[in-house]
Structures are given as C-alpha cells and as structure tokens.
C-alpha cells in the first residue's frame, strides 16, 4: 500500500501544460468523441487515455487490461492472480506486435476472467459480491506490484485504454476505431500527465479506472494527503498514487453510502461562512453534523481541481470551491457533455450532430450529475441518493 508520505509527489519533473478533459454521456459512435477531443491536445503534450462505457457489456465477464514492465513478469503475475482465486478464461495481446517496434511500450494484455465461487470468496475475503472481490484484488495487485505491472481496466462493462503518448497515438496503438460499429453510452477522454509525480509503471495516464468506476481530473489538490488519510481510515486502498485517485474514490464511497448530491457537495466543497449564515436552521444543523464527522472532514478538496467521474450509470462533474480551473457543460435530452473548455463541447455537438439546449459554466464548488437511462439523459437534482431514501 502507498504510504501517505509517498503519496503527494508535487510537480517535480513535469512539463508545463494543463489537462484536457472530455466526458460525454448519451448514445454515440466513438469517432465523433475522439475527433471532439482533438482540439484539447495543445494543452496536454503527452499522456492520453480513453474509457468507453458499454464496450464489454455483452460478454458477462470481468475484463482486465494489464501492462507489464517486461515479458518476464507476465507468467509470474498471471500466477499471482490465479493464487487469489481469479480464473483466467482467455488472454489476448491488446496491442499489435508492430507497435512495440514503433513505440516504447510495456507489454499490454487483456484477460477475460471469472471470480471465485461465493463460498471461496467468503473463505478468502469474507465477502460474497464478485464485483467487490475483483476490485479489492485489483487494488491489492496494483499496490503489491506497482513497479512491475498495473491493472488499468477491470470492468464487466467498460474498457480503459492508456498510453504515455498523444491521443492519436493511443487511438492507433489500441486500434480504438475497431470498435466504431457499435453505439456507446458514455466516454471519458483525458489528455496529459497528472500533476503529482506518482510511482510505478506508466503511472501517469488517466482515466483511472477500478471496476465500474472511472474518472478524469484537471488541476492539483493541495488537500491530497488529508484526502488519502480519510480513505486509508476507511480501509480503501490507494493503488495508483496520484492526487486524482482520491477524488474518484471519495466520490465512489459517498455515492455508495447514500449521501445526496447536496451532501457530497458540502463534504468536498465547503461553503463560505456567509453561505452557511443564509441556510435555514435545519439545513444548517445537517451541514455541521456532516462536515464535523472526523473522516468526512478530511474529504474536503482544496486547490485547483475540476473532474468528471463515471460511476455505474451516473456521470458527475466537480468544480473546485474557488473556480481555479475552467469547466463547462452542454446538454439536451439525448446527450450531456462535460469538458475543460467550451470549444470541446461545441466540437462534440458538431460531430454528434446535436443541438444543445444549454451550454454553461457551473458555479464554483458545484456538482452537476446526470443519469444514463436507455439512451436518454436525466439531470439529477441535489436530493438524489443512490438508494432513493435517506
């Protein structure tokens, strides 16, 4: 497990620039989203990744994408997965051999896997949910073998693809356009390395993906060590090693534990005193009860940060409390687009052939969320909770 002291690497050795973010939810072909993100490449220099929601939904298996430092590590670490009860049904090269001569790449493979039986999961980890078991083993693998390998996609539905190069290189290396014939429900694209130094094999590219959770982030949290401490106290493993990871894991925890969008906003983006003064007495009591929780108190995000989080059928956009990073949203009844620049949204609406009903920059510290519902997009109000009731 990564220690809190090692967690925040600062900006050492990183080129100037800013992350390019694009998140789209709706029904679309991939090429339109990829073309839309190209206008953000100037910000990013190198490091690019794509998460495609719905890529593997017909398979009914968990699919792992794993990068290895070299060929010698492959059999050794495949054996480690088997020892944890994970059955490898099929293994495939995710990258054509010719690209290993053109680019400096780790060995990249994909695996169709099944978890242990419920009885075996209970014996091994005292849990019976297959998705949770796989997530735990992925975090364990990435922590133990950080310098030798990284599982960067582990979903039954989504596929994540990362490189240390530009977006067009990522598309080429993985032959992303081979998936063009289908329609997809959501897509996240991130350009540039994160601002924390990180550790391990090809640590930098995003989206960071774990099970059905994926996220992208622009900025740098000054609160990352406190955020990491909160996750550590909850027993949630940090397994990639950048500040961005905290945002996504905190969002996942808060949604899973049935906090409303408004409460999540209170936790991660604290109100200014004058805003608290304007709250009615009951709301003020709720607010202080939540933010005075000793663990939730550490989840406050400080510093410049905008992020997009995809969790199951929910896509959420976060802005920092002081609006230190640009963030824009466009939408109609069929599509929701979030990006680090308005022109990426306009580009997406053009390539998607969609006329947007709204195009705006959210207020500082606001969370905006949408639910994907059979190709339609529903904006969620602040009272929304995963389980419906408090």
Identify what each model region corresponds to:
Residues 1-390:
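Conserved short alpha-helical segments that host acidic/polar catalytic motifs at enzyme active sites
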